[in-house]
């Protein structure tokens, strides 16, 4: 499925301002000010300068929290977003109840204690985010994430993303697959499944094991259209039911 740009000139703007460039600017800015986020339940609150809030928005990290404070802007980050900034980009620190967590392992263990499936979801999130795909929550579409080629203000999301492990019950039967594919197709998205291979149930799911030893397998699943295989169509067309393939574009 080709990118669906939201307005004329959006593609040119995206090419002129790649996400990777904005992320580099954000990384430098947050590191220089030694920005620190505060753990709050299953989110992280980050206080930043107005210019940094604009950079975070350009890079699609977090959501602005409305506040009467004018000097600082408050950004709410998901665990995946916060840990990506903390561990992968090394541009923010994380604190808990006023105490700065000394290393990434402490932060990792806290997030895993709040959300046991965090290792699997972070591995999937960092896999796509490291390839400069923009990820947002896919809750309203019945999936884990939606993936954008660039900022959501410029382009519609191309993929609805489901994260699975080897023992997951999702998409185990054909009816589940067809429902997921039809739902994604109805909102002009391709269903992308990310199979994260590893044992997530053991107590030894530590930081290094997850990030270095676990692997991610990408597959796209699309719906077969019977009208494309009628007798009056070219015999060179090849259709499959359903069409499952590796995501070569990522």
From Swiss-Prot:
Protein origin, superkingdom: Eukaryota
EC number assigned by the record: 4.6.1.16
Stretches for region Disordered: 225-250
Annotated InterPro entries: tRNA_endonuc-like_dom_sf, tRNA_intron_Endo_cat-like_sf, tRNA_intron_Endonuc_cat-like, tRNA_intron_Endonuc_N, tRNA_splic
GO CC annotation terms, alphabetical: nucleus
Active site per database record: 148, 156, 189
Record field: transmembrane: none
Keywords, alphabetical: Lyase, mRNA processing, Nucleus, tRNA processing
Enzyme class, first EC level, given as a word: lyase
Catalytic activity: pretRNA = a 3'-half-tRNA molecule with a 5'-OH end + a 5'-half-tRNA molecule with a 2',3'-cyclic phosphate end + an intron with a 2',3'-cyclic phosphate and a 5'-hydroxyl terminus
GO molecular function: lyase activity; nucleic acid binding; tRNA-intron endonuclease activity
Feature: compositional bias, Polar residues: 234-250
GO process annotations (BP): mRNA processing; tRNA splicing, via endonucleolytic cleavage and ligation
Location within or outside the cell: Nucleus
Membership in a protein family: Belongs to the tRNA-intron endonuclease family.
Subunit: tRNA splicing endonuclease is a heterotetramer composed of SEN2, SEN15, SEN34/LENG5 and SEN54.
Function: Constitutes one of the two catalytic subunit of the tRNA-splicing endonuclease complex, a complex responsible for identification and cleavage of the splice sites in pre-tRNA. It cleaves pre-tRNA at the 5'- and 3'-splice sites to release the intron. The products are an intron and two tRNA half-molecules bearing 2',3'-cyclic phosphate and 5'-OH termini. There are no conserved sequences at the splice sites, but the intron is invariably located at the same site in the gene, placing the splice sites an invariant distance from the constant structural features of the tRNA body.
Official protein name in the record: tRNA-splicing endonuclease subunit Sen2-2
Gene label: SEN2
């Amino acid at each position: 499925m080709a990118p669906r740009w939201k307005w004329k000139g959006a593609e040119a703007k995206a090419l002129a301002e790649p996400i990777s460039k904005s992320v580099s600017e954000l990384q430098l800015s947050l590191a220089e000010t030694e920005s620190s986020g505060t753990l709050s339940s299953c989110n992280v609150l980050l206080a930043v300068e107005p210019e940094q809030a604009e950079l975070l928005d350009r890079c699609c990290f977090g959501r602005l929290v409305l506040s009467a404070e004018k000097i600082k802007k408050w950004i709410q980050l998901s665990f995946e977003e916060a840990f990506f900034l903390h561990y992968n980009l090394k541009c923010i620190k994380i604190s808990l109840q006023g105490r700065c967590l000394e290393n990434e392992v402490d932060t990792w263990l806290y997030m895993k204690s709040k959300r046991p499936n965090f290792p699997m979801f972070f591995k999937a999130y960092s896999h796509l985010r490291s390839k400069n795909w923009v990820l947002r929550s896919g809750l309203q579409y019945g999936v884990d994430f939606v993936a954008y080629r660039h900022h959501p203000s410029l382009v519609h999301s191309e993929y609805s993303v489901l994260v699975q492990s080897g023992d997951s019950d999702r998409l185990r039967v054909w009816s589940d697959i067809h429902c997921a594919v039809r739902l994604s197709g109805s909102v002009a998205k391709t269903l992308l499944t990310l199979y994260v291979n590893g044992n997530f149930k053991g107590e030894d799911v530590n930081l290094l094991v997850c990030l270095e030893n676990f692997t991610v397998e990408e597959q796209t699943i699309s719906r077969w259209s019977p009208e494309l295989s009628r007798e009056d169509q070219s015999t060179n067309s090849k259709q499959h039911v359903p069409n499952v393939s590796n995501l070569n574009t990522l």
